[in-house]
Swiss-Prot record:
Species name: Chlorobium limicola (strain DSM 245 / NBRC 103803 / 6330)
Pfam hit, one: Glyco_tran_28_C
UniProt name for this protein: UDP-N-acetylglucosamine--N-acetylmuramyl-(pentapeptide) pyrophosphoryl-undecaprenol N-acetylglucosamine transferase
CDD domains xref list: GT28_MurG
Family: Belongs to the glycosyltransferase 28 family. MurG subfamily.
Cellular localisation: Cell inner membrane
Length: 364
């Protein structure tokens, strides 16, 4: 069996593909797996590091806006896309994949389109509640479309072959709350807030938490991943405390989730999948510049079930934002109800189920 994954640019598009590949090779150890990507995406370094073959294609994303510079840039990008489509066709002829799996990102479109034009079986895995342009356009001819949110179904112009399978996410070893809090050097029996904004951090969230830190640690613990860009600035402004762990990156994310009672973070698809799989209540702050405002749609999917609360990025400076977080942190009954609602949205075996669907599609 030969499977070609096309997706990347960011970890949110790449790692679901990697998770599927891992499960696929467990089920079919002799399978041939390779990835298509771009030289500027995260896949350029990650895929070789993980030991998979990588095929690089020259493709760029469209520039947004109506300025002359954006229009001229897009003309060049469309010319590049035509070349990428031809290269993708050549790649598919050489690799002869049984199934092509698209997970989003700039490279996904030409590879999926070329595969569809050549009559190959294709599977689209969409991470967000508001599907990207590639998913909406190419889902019409895809063999199967797998969504992470049921809310995304309304944007797909077909019913047959559409499944809500969840988003493949990192798996964690979860410890007891007590052991996890001990790992971070926190005070036992106090509620714990976990804050993160990705490996690079989230400046607006960090600035808000910096203002709230005394109020938070007065009666609670704080585990705070600042991201690499903000760490030095913030570390210099906070006092050491037995109720605070702060670092640029959390290596043991399983312990972070195990120790926490409430999570505050962005609403990217990977974070949402981790929250649902661990059943953690959250305060979500959608990244306001995400394409199509898709993080807001992701957040609203959880808010609508009672699993989370949403604070606009522009409202983080308001006193009400701090009060929302503090009130939740000290309301164990509400946190329990939110966590239960969040857990009901979980798809912990998403990667395995998707791998099984790929195997089924690959059969003659």
């Amino acid at each position: 069996m030969n499977v070609l994954f096309a997706g990347g640019g960011t970890g949110g598009h790449l790692y679901p593909a990697v998770a599927m590949a891992v499960e696929l090779l467990k089920l079919v150890p002799g399978a041939s797996v390779s990835f298509a990507g771009t030289k500027n995406g995260i896949e350029a370094s990650e895929i070789p590091r993980l030991g998979y073959r990588l095929h690089l294609l020259p493709v760029r994303g469209l520039k947004r806006g109506g300025s002359l510079r954006a229009i001229l840039a897009n003309v060049g990008i469309l010319i590049d896309f035509a070349g990428a489509l031809i290269n993708a066709g050549g790649l598919i002829r050489r690799e002869n994949p049984d199934v092509v799996v698209g997970t989003g990102g700039f490279v996904s479109a030409p590879v999926l389109l070329a595969a569809q034009m050549m009559g190959r079986r294709t599977l689209i895995q969409e991470q967000n509640a508001f599907p990207g342009v590639t998913t909406k356009l190419l889902s019409i001819l895809a063999s199967e479309i797998h969504l992470s949110f049921s809310e995304a179904q309304q944007y797909i112009r077909r019913n047959k072959g559409v499944f809500v399978s969840g988003n493949p996410a990192r798996s964690f070893t979860l410890n007891s709350r007590e052991k996890a809090q001990e790992h971070f050097g926190l005070q036992q029996q106090l509620p714990t807030l976990l804050v993160f904004g990705g490996s690079r951090g989230a400046r607006s969230i960090n600035s808000a938490v910096l203002k709230w830190i005394d109020a938070i640690t007065e009666r609670a613990n704080l585990v705070w991943q600042t991201g690499a860009l903000d760490y030095d600035r913030i570390r210099q402004q906070v006092k050491h405390s037995g109720r605070l762990w702060i670092g640029p990156y959390i290596e043991q994310m399983g312990d972070a989730y195990s120790a926490s009672d409430l999570v505050m973070c962005r609403a990217g698809a990977s974070s949402i999948a981790e929250l649902t799989n661990t059943g953690k209540p959250s305060v979500l702050v959608p990244y306001p510049y995400a394409t199509g405002d898709h993080q807001r749609y992701n957040a609203q999917a959880l808010v609508g079930t009672g699993a989370a609360m949403l604070i606009d990025d522009s409202h983080l400076d308001a006193p009400e934002a701090q009060q929302i977080v503090l009130d939740l942190l000290h309301d164990p009954h509400r946190l329990s109800a939110m966590g239960a609602s969040c857990g009901r949205l979980a798809h912990p075996d998403a990667a395995l189920q998707l791998a099984r669907r790929i195997i089924q599609l690959a059969k003659p």
